[in-house]
Each structure stands twice: as structure tokens, then as C-alpha cells.
Regions:
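Extreme N-terminal starter segment of soluble prokaryotic enzymes
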Residues: 1-3
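Conserved acid/base catalytic micro-environments in cytosolic active-site loops
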Residues: 5, 11-26, 32, 37-38, ...
């Protein structure tokens, strides 16, 4: 049974969330705290399998607690509970960069915790967080201009090999738990003249993916944006699927354009990587590079398996020891659809090697 620390300033919310967690035999709320300061005192002397952490609290909020834990070298598997607002999205991304493993959208009112499958999402996500590898989290370092410059030296060697690659290709990435932080080890190291579009399905609710795209664009050479309805995919551009909707890539000449669908969640997620991959079955690409990265569950595996029946596909899975949660890559590996397993820090160069760079600006 996993020991959980619950941190929330609302006594009523603590009671409701505690009841949900304790109803599952896998978990037990061991202790509660009503602000970050109380939680810090507890975490200085006790360890837990997971921490459910509110964002907005008096005395010390969730972000301040994460900074304090990092400053004191205290490791904890933390699940953030965030309200669904634009400010909430930005704060949540701050939390993920500071070491939180995942987040859930917490209803503003406690009585709504029984709606929209919140209880199932909470329990499933908490289970993934409790089983995440803290060592893998520590390996994912914040990106700086200096780290990009160092990696650029390696890229020059890769570019020489990639210069001769021709053809019409697409890179399609599936990622979930640990994604926002792990993507920082991939996207900023892709060149602006990458000879393919890159599409990312990151499991997130509506409102969060735009903030993620803006952050990724700010630290990357390649352009990054949230994919817009009707947009035609272009080489040298990264498109992040909008949260809360399924992304379908519709054939447009030899490429694709973006179309969103409001169909029900698939295998409990929306957007679904399976949905995106299967939409590429009649695409005009010569080859599709599928990348399955850290995350719980098996999203991506069925879609890639079906896609391989109709298209030339090269599947890269993130190597086990570099995953925060070895779930989605594990499913791909076990299904036998993986062509290569790659450590997180090498995924960008593998992408470059498989799609090449644009020659003479075209």
C-alpha cells in the first residue's frame, strides 16, 4: 500500500480527496498538511510514496515548496493539483520544471470532484507518480543556451550524415507523464532547418498545451506552436496537439493539414496518440518516424501497429532507464513494434539522422 501525503489549504477539499484516495486499496493517506510550510516540515523527516500538492496556499504555496525541496535536496514524487485557468496552466508548467512529476485538473468546488471521472484520473495518475523513477527525473536537466551550444557541436557531426537524406517524412511523437520536462531534452536540439514537420501528442487538458508550446518555442531554434485547425504542416516546425481534443492529420497533397475532433476519450486520454497515428494511414509521406516517450499506459502502440500495415514507419522508443514512467515505451517494446530504443539525450540526433536537414533553404 502506497503512503500518501495530501497538501491542500481547504479542509473540505482534503476530506473529499482523502476519501477518494483511501477508497483505493493501493493507497492510504498517511498525513495531511494545510500549506507548503507544514508539508516541508513533514518531508524533512518522513518519506512518502507520493505527494498530492495544491498550488495556491497561504504561508507557502506549491511552487515555493518545490523550490524549498530542491534547495534542501529532498526528493519526493509529487502530483500537482491545479485549477483549469491560463494562470493555472503557467504555474503548473513551472511546477513540472521544478520537479513535479505530473498534474491533474482539480475542480474549483469540492462537490464537483465526483464529476467528469476526476476520481479515476486522480487514482490512475497518482499510481503512475508513485511508481515513477526519481533517478530519471534527476537526469532531466533544465535547458540553457550553454547546453544548446554544446549539443550544437555534436549536431554538426550529425548534419553531415543527414545531408544526403531525401524524401518526404514526418516525425510524430507520443508522450505523457514527465513529458513537458523530457521534451526539453529533445525539441530545443532540433535545427530550424529540419527536413520534416514534427507533431506531438502530449496528454494534457485544454488550455495547457498553448502555454507548453510558448515555453518550448522560447528555448528552441526550431519554431514551436500549438497546432491550429486547418493548418498545413511545414518542415522545420513543431506542432503540439491542442489539449482536450483529438488531432487528426488529413492528407493534403504529399503532406497533411490539421483537423480536430471532439470524439470521446480513447483509452481514457484526449488527445490520443493512437487516434493521430491511425489518421496517417492514407498520408502522402514516404516515411513516418514515430517516437514513443515517457508516460503511463499504452497510448501509441495500437496506432503505430496499425500504421505499419499501410505505411513505411520507423519506431523509436525512449530507453527504459531514461523514462520517468516506463509505460508507453514499454508497451511499444513488448508489442514488438520498436525499431530502436534510444536514451532521452540522444533522441534529437536520431530524429535528425532519420529525416535530414533542408538543403539550400528548401
Amino acid at each position: 500500500m502506497k503512503k500518501i501525503l495530501l497538501v491542500d489549504d481547504s479542509a473540505l477539499m482534503r476530506r473529499v480527496v482523502s476519501d477518494i484516495i483511501n477508497s483505493d486499496k493501493r493507497f492510504h493517506i498517511e498525513k495531511e498538511a494545510k500549506n507548503g510550510l507544514e508539508a516541508l516540515e513533514i518531508l524533512r523527516t518522513e518519506t512518502f510514496d507520493g505527494v498530492v500538492l495544491d498550488v495556491n496556499m497561504p504561508k507557502m504555496d506549491g511552487i515555493e515548496l518545490l523550490r524549498a525541496l530542491a534547495s534542501e535536496g529532498i526528493s519526493a514524487r509529487i502530483l500537482m493539483a491545479s485549477t483549469l485557468t491560463m494562470d493555472g496552466a503557467k504555474v503548473t508548467l513551472d511546477a513540472l520544471e521544478l520537479g513535479a512529476l505530473d498534474f491533474i485538473h482539480k475542480p474549483e468546488w469540492s462537490y464537483k470532484c465526483k464529476e467528469n471521472n476526476f476520481d479515476k484520473e486522480l487514482l490512475d495518475t497518482l499510481y503512475a507518480v508513485c511508481n515513477a523513477k526519481l533517478k530519471s527525473v534527476a537526469k532531466v536537466k533544465p535547458v540553457t543556451r550553454r547546453t544548446i551550444e554544446i549539443q550544437t557541436g555534436v549536431e554538426q557531426l550529425v548534419r553531415k550524415k543527414a545531408a544526403s537524406i531525401t524524401g518526404n517524412r514526418l516525425v510524430a511523437i507520443a508522450i505523457s507523464t514527465g513529458g513537458p520536462k523530457s521534451l526539453q531534452s529533445v525539441i530545443p536540439f532540433l535545427p530550424e532547418d529540419l527536413n520534416a514537420p514534427v507533431v506531438i501528442v502530449q496528454h494534457m487538458p485544454v488550455g495547457f498545451t498553448e502555454s507548453l508550446a510558448q515555453r518550448m518555442d522560447a528555448i528552441s531554434r526550431i519554431a514551436v506552436s500549438e497546432a491550429k485547425e486547418g493548418e498545413v504542416l511545414e518542415n522545420g516546425h513543431v506542432y503540439i496537439a491542442r489539449g482536450g481534443q483529438h488531432l487528426k492529420l488529413v492528407k493534403s497533397g504529399r503532406g497533411s493539414r490539421v483537423h480536430y475532433s471532439d470524439e470521446p476519450p480513447r483509452e481514457g486520454v484526449k488527445p490520443s496518440a493512437n487516434y493521430m497515428y491511425e489518421s496517417l494511414s492514407d498520408s502522402g509521406y514516404d516515411e513516418i518516424i514515430c517516437v514513443v516517450m515517457t508516460g503511463m499506459g499504452s497510448d501509441g502502440t495500437e496506432g503505430i501497429r496499425n500504421l505499419k500495415l499501410n505505411k513505411k514507419v520507423y519506431c523509436i522508443s525512449q530507453e527504459k532507464n531514461s523514462c520517468i514512467v516506463y509505460g508507453m515505451p514499454k508497451a511499444a517494446d513488448k508489442a514488438g513494434i520498436t525499431d530502436e530504443s534510444v536514451e532521452l539525450g540522444n533522441i534529437a540526433q536520431e530524429i535528425i539522422l532519420h529525416v535530414g536537414v533542408m538543403q539550400n533553404g528548401c
